[in-house]
């Protein structure tokens, strides 16, 4: 057997996608619903946990306990303004636990709180299972993508989510870099090309400029808006229709979460329709206080509602060009990534900005990132096929990294857009006479003063021998590895004494113990989900057996072959079981199985007696189907009330 493949996962804000490189090409893997992208949603109910399509489909019924957008929380502090402003829009509750955000839900009748890493790990587990179902063997190795804009803490937290999901994360790579790989594979050997990647997804917007030369990718610049995407366009439509509902019906639905959620689902559908048609209609029965809401919207109106958002996508394009020191005429290829790039107006704005240049849409925009991640996974696993052999990947640091020097000045050691992995060393000294130690404070950001940048961590180097200011030599080294994880070391040259920090924990990262605990819990939840599945199938098996027996003895063809007493005996027992089922829908698996045995003891002798003479099926021939419930037997799906 060939060795197990590694997978590439695009962990998106709203949708995720998984791919695998095998037999010389990438397969994007469809989930059990046949969809090639899976909603990044996790829902908790009184009885079970749902992930993906199943979670998103029940969101209107259970908004408080359906979690999405975990990517907007991951690796951030609770007090982060982004978190604070996003919380206003979410129907689920975010609580503060030591300045770490946690999502609070009700699950199986208890209140539970989860870290964003745990929610993301559930989505990753789902993606892992989708791949395993397709490949037919367990998968552990994966490459996971993040926005180019993600800082160290967000990258670390994403990696932790992978670990909790039971994955060995080979590498975290930038989404645009992954898209470039998807694109570059087919494009090797054409001399140097400058490629601009325009990635407008469900929740984030990234513009990246890469140079591809003979299979070598180099990221020249990244820019973007961590908070622009398809959801924002949905919100504009939602607001538009809330106002329309007020005008038509003099009622404000905006405080009714379920109504807004149903409206949002319809808006998302309308938005997708408007990418291919010039008009879309919405029909929502009994949206609010029994009022049906039937309306429509034109593409022109939609473009007008979002015009400022659409136009704002060009600012990061200009910024990236400036950072890469390129003129727009020097860009060879424009690549569209992310579902929202299907919007005709967005395409037109970009095309006009580049004076009518053709856009590259040959890659399915929803799948390009997972495609590239799958290729990268194959490279890291040492895939020998010539398609991937010559590909080398150079990533960049998204923000400058440095330390605070006297007066709160930011002194950058690693400049933004430096190719990583990289290592930079600089000599610093003391600020006052006989200073016994120095405090090394590590920041990321582009501003001149550290107070405007983001503190990553700090540590002391003490025990410096007394000396006049400016004499001691302290060598500081910043070292970023291929995953974008930073090690900072300070060494006193006179004594050789050193101290270092790996930038992780001070960023509110989870500790080893917490990750370990979450891995255990993830296993536990998975086991519970399994028990739930078995319970439901035992219930369905019992239900279908009871209904089958009932219809068997009521069959007209059996008139005269079965005594009324026997018939009554079977019908009474079936009715008893059916009533018991209605009253005990939440019983355990063995209770259902026990009831079924009880029922079989009554029915089997009677039914098999019927067929002794007729040479029909032996005992239990009727409805003794396995847990799946036979053809047309009892409901195998339960309706949610």
Swiss-Prot record:
Keywords: Acetylation, ATP-binding, Chaperone, Cytoplasm, Cytoskeleton, Host cell receptor for virus entry, Host-virus interaction, Methylation, Nucleotide-binding, Nucleus, Phosphoprotein, Receptor, Secreted, Stress response. It is found in: Cytoplasm; Nucleus; Cytoplasm, Cytoskeleton, Microtubule organizing center, Centrosome; Secreted. Induction: By heat shock. Pfam families: HSP70 (PF00012). The modification Phosphoserine is found at residues 631, 633. SUPFAM superfamilies: Actin-like ATPase domain, Heat shock protein 70kD (HSP70), C-terminal subdomain, Heat shock protein 70kD (HSP70), peptide-binding domain. InterPro entries: ATPase_NBD (IPR043129), Heat_shock_70_CS (IPR018181), HSP70_C_sf (IPR029048), HSP70_peptide-bd_sf (IPR029047), Hsp_70_fam (IPR013126). The modification N6,N6-dimethyllysine is found at residue 561. Changing residue 77 to R: Significant loss of acetylation and ATPase activity. Decreased binding to HOPX and HSP90 and increased binding to STUB1 and NAA10. It is linked to In certain aggressive cases of activated B cell-like diffuse large B-cell lymphoma (ABC-DLBCL), plays a role in the cytoplasmic sequestration of misfolded N-terminal mutated PRDM1 proteins, promotes their association with SYNV1/HRD1 and degradation through the SYNV1-proteasome pathway. HSPA1A inhibition restores PRDM1 nuclear localization and transcriptional activity in lymphoma cell lines and suppresses growth in xenografts. PANTHER family: HEAT SHOCK PROTEIN 70KDA. This is Heat shock 70 kDa protein 1A. It comes from Homo sapiens (Human). The lineage of its organism: Eukaryota, Metazoa, Chordata, Craniata, Vertebrata. The gene is HSPA1A.
């Amino acid at each position: 057997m060939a060795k197990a493949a590694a997978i590439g996962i695009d962990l998106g804000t709203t949708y995720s996608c998984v791919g695998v490189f095998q037999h010389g090409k990438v397969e994007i893997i469809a989930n059990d619903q046949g969809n090639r992208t899976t909603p990044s949603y996790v829902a908790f109910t009184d009885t079970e946990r749902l992930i993906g399509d199943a979670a998103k489909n029940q969101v209107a019924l259970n908004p408080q306990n359906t979690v999405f957008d975990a990517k907007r929380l991951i690796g951030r502090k609770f007090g982060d303004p982004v978190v604070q402003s996003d919380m206003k829009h979410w129907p689920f509750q975010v609580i503060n636990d030591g300045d770490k955000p946690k999502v609070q839900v009700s699950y199986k009748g208890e209140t539970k709180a989860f870290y964003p890493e745990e929610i993301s790990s559930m989505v990753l587990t789902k993606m892992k299972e989708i791949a395993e179902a397709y490949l037919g063997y367990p998968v552990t190795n994966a490459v996971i993508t993040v926005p180019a804009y993600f800082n160290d803490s967000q990258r670390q937290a994403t990696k932790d989510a992978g670990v909790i999901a039971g994955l060995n994360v080979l590498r975290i790579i930038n989404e645009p870099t992954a898209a470039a790989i998807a694109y570059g594979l087919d494009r090797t050997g054409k001399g140097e090309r400058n490629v601009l990647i325009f990635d407008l997804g469900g929740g984030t917007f990234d513009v990246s400029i890469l140079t591809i030369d003979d299979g070598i990718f180099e990221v020249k610049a990244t820019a973007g808006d961590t908070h622009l995407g398809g959801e924002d366009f949905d919100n504009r439509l939602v607001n538009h229709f809330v106002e329309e509902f007020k005008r038509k019906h003099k009622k404000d639905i905006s405080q009714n979460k379920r109504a807004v959620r149903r409206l949002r689902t319809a808006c998302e559908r309308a938005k997708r329709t408007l990418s291919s048609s010039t008009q879309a209609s919405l029909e929502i029965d009994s949206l609010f206080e029994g009022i049906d809401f039937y309306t429509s919207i034109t593409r022109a109106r939609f473009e007008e509602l979002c015009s400022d958002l659409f136009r704002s996508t060009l600012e990061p394009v200009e910024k990236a060009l400036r950072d890469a020191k390129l003129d727009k005429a020097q860009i060879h290829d424009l690549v569209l990534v992310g579902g929202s790039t299907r919007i005709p107006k967005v395409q037109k704005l970009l095309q006009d900005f580049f004076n009518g240049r053709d856009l590259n849409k040959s890659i399915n925009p929803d799948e390009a990132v997972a495609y590239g991640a799958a290729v990268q996974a194959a490279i890291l696993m040492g895939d020998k096929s010539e398609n991937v052999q010559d590909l080398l990947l150079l990533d960049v640091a998204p923000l400058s990294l440095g330390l605070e020097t006297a007066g709160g000045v930011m002194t950058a050691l690693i400049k933004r857009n430096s190719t990583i992995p990289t290592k930079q060393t600089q000599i610093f000294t003391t600020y006052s006479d006989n200073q016994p130690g120095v405090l090394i404070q590590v920041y990321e950001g582009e501003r001149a003063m550290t107070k405007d940048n983001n503190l990553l961590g700090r540590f002391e180097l003490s025990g410096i021998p007394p000396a006049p200011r400016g004499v001691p030599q302290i060598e500081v080294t910043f070292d970023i590895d291929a995953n974008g994880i930073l090690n900072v070391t300070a060494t006193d040259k006179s004594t050789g004494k050193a101290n270092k920090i790996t930038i992780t924990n001070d960023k509110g990262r989870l500790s080893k113990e917490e990750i370990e605990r979450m891995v255990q819990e993830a296993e536990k939840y998975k086991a519970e989900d399994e028990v739930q599945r078995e319970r439901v199938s035992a219930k369905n098996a019992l239900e279908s057996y009871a209904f089958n027996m009932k219809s068997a003895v009521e069959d007209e063809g059996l008139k005269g072959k079965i005594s009324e007493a026997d018939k009554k005996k079977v019908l009474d027992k079936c009715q008893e079981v059916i009533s018991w089922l209605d009253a005990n829908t939440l019983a355990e698996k063995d209770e259902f199985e026990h009831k079924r045995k009880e029922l079989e003891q009554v029915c089997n002798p009677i039914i098999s007696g019927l067929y002794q003479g007729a040479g029909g099926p032996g005992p239990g021939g009727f409805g003794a189907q396995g847990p799946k419930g036979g053809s047309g037997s009892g409901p195998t799906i339960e309706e949610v009330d």
